[in-house]
Amino acid sequence: MLKDAHVKIAHLSDLHVLALEDATPARLMNKRLTGWLNLKFRRAHEHQAYALNAVARAIRERTDIDHVVVTGDLTNLALESEFNAAHAYLRDELGLDPTRVSVIPGNHDAYTRGAYESHRFERTFADYMSSDLPGAAAMAENSAFPYVRLRGPVAVIGLTTAVPRPPLVASGEVGALQLLALHAILAHAEVRSRFPVILLHHPWHPPANPLKARLNGLDDREALRSVLDSVPRGLLLHGHLHRRMRRQLGTAEGHFDAIGATSASLIHDDPDRMSGFNVYEIDETGLVHAEAFRLDERGSRFEPAAIPSV
């Protein structure tokens, strides 16, 4: 694909694929217990496989989508059975070559320290995180992030903000090593000549409530802003909040559009939260158009929906 071509990117997030075969009593004797209870009494009823499959089918059947990004929380409890089911979803339901799909983890994918330290996410989805600049990853043992995928006029940069936290805490962190690597990536000639699309699960903008910001926000957001400050334009794509939204992050040289996708599997009365996906049209000048598609009440088709500015 030529660098001056248009690219269309589909954005889905927070799949929360349900596959609890490995949720044995012994493996629930940690943070997973609160998560399992939440699933049993609430989340399992809100997140539905038929909605998730409808999203995959709608994207797969479109002929104008060049690339797909998934911004985290593919699982619920970071169990092997969930990772295997999420991989099968990408392989079989979405059905696109891994070079056309970029994924990053969310806090649910690093739900326990064991899942995090064993690099369960990275091992499962390695094909969906291959980098066109393999030396760009943070200088840490077995680090796969950040990765870079050069697609026409776009440089897709995958970050992880997923770190294990205590029960009831869902905050994220980029970390010093990743920030150093990101700084070098943004200065790379192949990236500087393209429009950067940065994937991170946690949004840069914190919740208005100070307690929610502490429990659910991005801990080193100001350090990330410092790295982005010299970039004149770009796109920050996130999930985590299960809500469509659009904001701006100003930099010294310009701004980033910060856009969130709702959960692809969520059934909800709020139209801004109902299952769906976003689509972005990008050319060599930057973001041309952003639109969303929402699952209708019958669960049979997707209709255009606004991405609210908040």
Describe the function of each predicted region.
Residues M1-E82:
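N-terminal active-site segment of His-dependent metallophosphoesterases
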Residues H11-S13, H67-G72, R100-N107, T160, ...:
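Active-site neighborhood of phospho(di)ester-bond hydrolases with catalytic His/Asp-centered motifs
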Residues H16-L20, N76-L79, N107-A115, P164-V169, ...:
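Active-site environment of divalent metal-dependent phosphoester hydrolases
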Residues R165-E173, A189-G234, L241:
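Active-site-proximal segments of metal-dependent phosphoesterases and phosphodiesterases across multiple
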Residues L211-T285:
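Conserved beta-sheet core of the metallophosphoesterase superfamily
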